[in-house]
Amino acid sequence: MLEELKSKEKVIGIKQSLKAVENGTVKTVYIAKDADEKVVNPLKELSKKNALEIIYIENMKQLGKACGIDVGAAAVCIIKDIW
């Protein structure tokens, strides 16, 4: 599951994730369980509205590390394959 975060095209962070979901380019949404609810709720709601799969990861540090960054991430979205 987390291997996908290293190998696939993705966007990292709440703002970029919201934009990607609004644009209809997202396949899967990953959200850290320890992220502030006020921050991630808009993404959760929009993802549910668009019938996207949401996968919850234990914490922001683990989600960031899985993406190959040295800081935590509240949310990450995997972009749909274009072809």
Question: What annotation goes with each model-predicted range?
Answer:
Residues 35-61:
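Feature captures the catalytic cores and cofactor-binding loops of soluble hydro-lyases/lyases
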Residues 52-83:
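C-terminal structural segments of small proteins and small subunits
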